[in-house]
Swiss-Prot record:
InterPro entries: AB_hydrolase_fold, KANL3/Tex30_Abhydrolase, NSL3/Tex30. The lineage of its organism: Eukaryota, Metazoa, Chordata, Craniata, Vertebrata. This is Testis-expressed protein 30. The gene is TEX30. It comes from Homo sapiens (Human). It comes from the Eukaryota.
Amino acid sequence: MSHTEVKLKIPFGNKLLDAVCLVPNKSLTYGIILTHGASGDMNLPHLMSLASHLASHGFFCLRFTCKGLNIVHRIKAYKSVLNYLKTSGEYKLAGVFLGGRSMGSRAAASVMCHIEPDDGDDFVRGLICISYPLHHPKQQHKLRDEDLFRLKEPVLFVSGSADEMCEKNLLEKVAQKMQAPHKIHWIEKANHSMAVKGRSTNDVFKEINTQILFWIQEITEMDKKCH
């Protein structure tokens, strides 16, 4: 399915956040917000590849850049983007999925667990965590799991089985205690950057993109049956 690229500036305090939307050339239903990790920006090859894959299957996709290592700042920026989409007269979406890579997924998780039930028009449908940074390398005793336990909407984790910031058995233990419906897809032998020895980057991207699309489609199909 064809789509159009639209560049945006989203108000955030007295600044503007750079964003790019891929808008499918059909009536819109669901959208996905994506952002980068501690380094890079919205033009990270993997985010571009994922956005393009989702848009080609009919999903509105917004990527945005928010630089800086201050997680509170990143969370506020993410909230501004979500509010922009929610109140946008231009893109009337039935719901959105919040997503991000590494630190971006932490920001998305925090935004999602602080949505008040009375905001509750079910606009946010799920969370996509790519390389969720559960702990600093070699600091497995300090887990960033508080927000994960507060989530209620469905969560998809896509992580490398050799991720130095997300030990496999630790994420599995955390997931077992979560109240939200969740799924973990492990990319075999991938590190935190999703690099796998002996596998091309595009091949890894393809696996990740396929898993994410399938998971989103499962939820949106269920939505259609319920309404």
